[in-house]
């Protein structure tokens, strides 16, 4: 899903899978005790064609989602994560429904489920908690920092809620009674990613996954950053930390 390939026509196979993932990301996402060396011992017991097909299918699903308007794309991308399973009890990938429950209850924004939080809504509904919701989502210059993103689903929720408010502004300013064209919606989305959403990740793969969730395979700036020795960087090199976060490098 998140792997960065030099040639996107290349397949992810049992033979190159471990090479595509840095050691820290492997340790973070794989079940405890399953080293790269141990994984190689498992290879004869996997179906190589099935492994390759599943990897390609996930990436194709993202490419299909990239053709949709932002609201529909959020639904499609979040649905992909419903196919994933937690690697082990120490590495929990928070489900999209729980993200909606958590953030919707705390600060509001656009929730993609009904009031019972059981069924996905046709269109997201806005939850307004007053001052905190206004400060986070209705301030057009808001800057939102997500710390320790693994999947990008939390910043996806935040980005959509900021995007939806800016889309309303565009519609009002242009006095549109119809839907805003998808290309303009996408440009608003890209601007939100560039100007309003900032993400810190614990590993390189978490950064790649988060970027894939937010922008897919499209060329858009995402301010996602992986830092080694994060506490030291914040404490002793704060100016450099802020610049790198803003640059998304």
Q: What kind of region is each of these model predictions?
A:
Residues 1-249:
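SAM-dependent methyltransferase catalytic region
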């Amino acid at each position: 899903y998140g792997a960065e390939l030099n040639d996107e026509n290349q397949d992810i196979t049992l033979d190159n899978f471990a090479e595509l993932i840095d050691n820290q990301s492997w340790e973070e996402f794989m079940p405890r005790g399953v080293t790269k060396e141990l994984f190689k011992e498992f290879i004869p017991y996997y179906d190589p064609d099935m492994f390759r097909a599943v990897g390609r299918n996930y990436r194709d699903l993202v490419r299909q989602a990239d053709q949709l308007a932002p609201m529909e794309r959020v639904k499609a991308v979040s649905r992909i994560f419903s196919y994933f399973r937690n690697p082990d009890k120490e590495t929990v990938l928070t489900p999209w429904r729980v993200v909606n429950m958590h953030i919707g209850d705390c600060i509001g924004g656009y929730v993609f489920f009904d009031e019972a939080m059981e069924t996905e809504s046709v269109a997201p509904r806005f939850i307004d908690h007053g001052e905190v919701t206004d400060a986070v989502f209705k301030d057009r210059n808001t800057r939102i920092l997500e710390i320790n993103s693994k999947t990008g689903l939390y910043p996806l929720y935040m980005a959509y809620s900021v995007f939806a408010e800016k889309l309303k502004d565009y519609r009002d300013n242009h006095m549109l009674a119809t839907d805003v064209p998808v290309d303009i919606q996408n440009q608003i989305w890209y601007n939100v990613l560039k100007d309003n959403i900032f993400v810190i990740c614990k590993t390189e793969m978490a950064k790649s996954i988060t970027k894939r969730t937010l922008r897919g395979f499209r060329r858009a700036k995402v301010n996602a950053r992986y830092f080694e020795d994060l506490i030291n960087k914040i404490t002793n090199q704060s100016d450099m930390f802020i610049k790198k976060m803003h640059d998304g490098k």
